[in-house]
């Protein structure tokens, strides 16, 4: 399974820990990190959603401070 992961700055620590754990999982063939230090939650939400819609990944995982922003975006 290919997974895109993304987070704005306030979710970076959790995102990094999850990406590391996913990379160790034998069921996951690729973890695509679409984050940058200055990215906002709407931007990263759109990038992860687009990666799923275009078929570049099978699943998307978004992390932010509360989850509300990424859910709305």
Description of each model-found segment:
Residues 1-24:
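Glycine-rich phosphate/diphosphate-binding loop of Rossmann-like nucleotide-binding domains
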Residues 6, 29-32, 60-64:
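Short, conserved beta-strand edge motifs with alternating hydrophobic and charged residues
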Residues 10, 67-68:
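A generic "binding-loop/recognition-motif" signal
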Residues 12-13, 38, 42:
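Loop/helix-junction capping segments adjacent to catalytic residues or to phosphate/diphosphate-binding pockets
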Residues 22-27, 56:
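Short helix-capping segments at alpha-helix termini
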Residues 27-40:
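A short beta-strand-loop structural module common to alpha/beta enzyme folds
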Residues 44-66:
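Short, structured active-site "lid" loops
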Residues 69-73:
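Short Gly/Thr/Asp-enriched flexible loops that form oxyanion-binding sites at enzyme active sites
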